[in-house]
Amino acid sequence: MKAWRFLYRRGFIEGFGHISVRLPGTDTYMLTRHSLGRIIVPDDMLVYDMNGKQLAGKGDRPGEAPIHHEIFRARPDVNSIIHYHGMHATAFTTSAEHTLRPIHLMGTLFADGLPIYNDPRLVSTTERGVALAKALGSHRAALLYAHGGVVTGGDIEESVTGAFFLEENAHRAYLSCTLGKPKWIDPEVANDAAAELIRTRGPMRRVWAMVEIEGVE
């Protein structure tokens, strides 16, 4: 719930995105309900099994619940997913001139690439959820053309950190593009930097420290 409040206050969610977390040691996951505002209570977290059956929680499921269901099914390594509609990251999906790449240290978390799912429609069906999971592949995140982004993590700290720095990197890249030709980080350097950040978990600790402060009621 702290993660939701943090992302809402930071403008990532604004009533349209959603967060999910796999429940450890089970074949179930929690997903924030449809039309959730800044205020969140335990019943706003819906619990589903891998057959799509709702086990707990109150309220309607998000229309794009297949995003979470199909990625969890396809990626046993993923334990948390965030879908949001970041202004700057999404802008790069509609540019014929620029492809979003790491341009800032923390953006190297996505040095493995940012595949684009080329369907702007809501991921509201099983078929589209499967297609998105396929587009994501083994990557940390994917962009949805003219729509938004999906960020995964081994835990909630990783997914929140990923969403935070995906949008920050996109914002910095946008500013660089407006100044002229952007100077992207060399891929080899980006891969080395990413490995170090992931190994030390420094970014995760720092972002989660902000969540602990800003995510209170």
Question: What is each PLM-predicted segment?
Answer:
Residues 1-217:
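Glycine-rich flexible loops
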